[in-house]
A protein has these predicted regions:
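Sequence signature of WD/YWTD-type beta-propeller architectures
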Residues: 1-259
Length: 259
């Protein structure tokens, strides 16, 4: 079903561009991933990287369908939907990764630093306002799953926008734990979990209505999925897997607003 040997949420798949006239996708061409746009009928395929030489993924269109973002050779770029006015977001760091548009399309969230030592950053869609949003306190930024059969030994644990775009959820080291945090765009941090020693939380995924958040949690050596009510921080366990299994990357099912 895919030519990408490491399937993840940031590799991207086929996605609709706002306006309903085009689709975005990342084909492998000569072993190199490229950000492409095409018409709904599959015609008029265009590489929006402006001939960039790097391996590109983390690809997505802004909510209004006018801009795209992606990282190429671990540097983040923004351009118009047709690939024009390509802009390199220069952080000064060698590892910039996994850009995500805010729900209103004003901001871009991504991680920046070095491999295994990164932090969440934000920048405006015009390339201004770049700043570090929070500190992971040395957390490597990926969850290992060596006890579960898989081609790779880890899965990136990257931050996520809140439903209203006013804050970001992320995981960071706190003592011997990796806990779940929320930070507003002006840098106010709230710790959402306070767990027994050795607990590792990962993959925060807020609900579309902003009332709950899904996440993974490794306690007693087994990775399970949990849901938390953000109003009072109460949580409930969703999976009950046995040793040798692990649950990761939770997703909310879309619900139509139509009756």
């Amino acid at each position: 079903m895919t030519a990408v040997d490491r399937v993840s949420h940031y590799n991207g798949g086929l996605f609709f561009v706002a306006g309903g006239k085009s689709l975005g996708f990342t084909p492998l061409i000569g072993g190199v991933s490229r950000p492409y746009i095409m018409d709904m009928d599959g015609r008029d395929k265009r590489d929006v990287s402006a001939g960039g030489p790097g391996f590109a993924y983390g690809y997505g269109a802004s909510p209004d369908g006018n801009r795209v973002c992606y990282h190429e050779n671990y540097q983040v770029y923004i351009s118009n939907i047709d690939g024009s006015e390509k802009k390199h977001i220069k952080t000064g760091n060698p590892f910039d990764f996994a850009p995500k548009w805010s729900p209103d399309g004003v901001w871009l969230l991504f991680v920046s630093g070095t491999h295994g030592h990164w932090n969440p950053y934000i920048v405006k869609r015009d390339g201004t306002g770049l700043r570090k949003l929070a500190d992971l306190n040395g957390y490597q930024g990926w969850i290992l799953f060596l006890d579960v059969p898989d081609f790779h030994d880890g899965s990136s644990d990257i931050p996520a926008w809140s439903a209203d775009g006013g804050s970001v959820f992320y995981t960071a080291k706190s003592g011997s734990n990796v806990e779940l945090f929320q930070v507003t765009l002006d840098g106010a941090v709230k710790q959402l979990t306070r767990s027994p020693p050795g607990t590792l939380h990962y993959h925060p995924t807020p609900s579309p209505d902003g009332k709950q958040i899904l996440y993974g949690s490794m306690r007693s050596g087994i990775r399970q999925l949990y849901a938390m009510n953000l109003s009072d921080h109460t949580e409930r366990q969703l999976t009950r897997l046995s040793s040798g299994h692990g649950a990761m990357w939770p997703h909310w099912r879309p619900v139509s607003s139509q009756p």
